[in-house]
Amino acid sequence: MNYKIGIMSLLVITSIIFLFLVPDKVEAQKECIGPCDMFTDCQAACVGIRKGYNYGQCVAWKPKDDDPFTCCCYKLTP
């Protein structure tokens, strides 16, 4: 029975150590380039502007005018 407690303690300590080794977080820098109906492919438009963006996505914001969907480009930085 004592060896099970020892093994579980070792696993808990090891997992806590791994938490400190993992980087804090990965943040995405974004720039919105226009409404989605203006671009046929938001992903291709973001990669095509050659500012180092990794991907693009149509994002829905609060409904303002007619089209709430905006094409936003993202760049992942560690």
Curated annotation (Swiss-Prot):
GO-annotated biological processes: defense response to fungus; killing of cells of another organism
Pfam families named in the record: AtDEF-like
Lineage: superkingdom: Eukaryota
Cellular localization per UniProt: Secreted
Keyword field: Antimicrobial, Disulfide bond, Fungicide, Plant defense, Secreted, Signal
Signal peptide annotation: 1-28
One GO term describing the cellular component: extracellular region
Disulfide bond annotation, renumbered to this chain: C32-C73, C36-C58, C42-C71, C46-C72
Major location category of this protein: secreted
InterPro entries on file: DEFL
Family: Belongs to the DEFL family.
Name of this chain's protein: Defensin-like protein 74
Organism: Arabidopsis thaliana (Mouse-ear cress)
Lineage, broadest ranks: Eukaryota, Viridiplantae, Streptophyta, Embryophyta, Tracheophyta
Designated gene of the protein: LCR43
